[in-house]
């Protein structure tokens, strides 16, 4: 286990090392560039205005008695971004407001991004502040941009990018406030973790369309239960992502394994795997197919101190995989019944997702997508069939100009008795979701000097 003092010492050493390593090379780079071009500075102001209306029938109820659930609402998200760039330095700030039309109060306003990055001629860089993380297919670390609040992290990132190689190391430490009287316990904060360290390596062959990534994550979480105050439990994730993308077809796959201990000091041993292939017979058509499997538990998990679960079986090992901080809406069906929302009473039976899709692009500005998902739990249970349901998805995207995107979609799921039992959805098994999304990305100003 990595202690609190070791975390602070390691972080201080890294900051000092980067500070000594970067300045001489970046200053020399800036001086050489200045002699050739006087306009070294670029300042940009842009925005993103997103409005999305949704209609749900048979969604996620608040209680067992509210099975037949309907909802319709309009969401809005507004971002204003300031960007500064010079030869060796970049800085970016994004303010974000999100709300439901008619919502009492002022909605949610936060500083979504606020970071500065120094880069050297040799490919070394350091980036510190609140920033968006997006790696590989975003299955484990992503922006989660479909959610109105999206996801960003306050951390230090250092790395190297050159030739066919990229290496990124990330270090995060979270606290509730700056008060020394509050101790070092971190609960109910902006992020679920107190400590996080990630190491990512990517290799892209310069002449062959093959890429490979390795990812390691170490996450320290403190429990909300009083029995576990002042204890930080660490869980790890390690895995790989591979892709091969020649001209008209592609194949990609990933495997991740989780281990360590969760916030209730329970052992973790979980895994997930995915494969995906696509083929484009013409420029207008693309066929897509794939399979995801995420390990699960055959029974409800109960922590040593109790407090959650049905109490049916006491687990010593958690086998239900958690996709941690990925962009979950991209996977496992567009209706977001899995991993963006939990199973009933915290059950984690895992998931299998078989899918097929067709994409049609009649013109450059217009695209239609159709997909089918067969969804099932991954474990054998004594009282439930594996099948969760069948989901059909239809969507269209129209981009009349680069600043404007119009999107709409409709999804239908026929859920099984297992779906009804685990997700408490509509008893007739038929679930509907329709949405319309409008995104405008204007650029107000860009100046160079």
Regions found by a protein language model. Name each.
Residues 57-61, 95, 132-140, 170-182, ...:
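Flexible, solvent-exposed coil segments and beta strand-coil junctions
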Residues 57-64, 102-109, 138-145, 179-188, ...:
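Outer-membrane beta-barrel translocator domains and adjoining extracellular loop/strand segments
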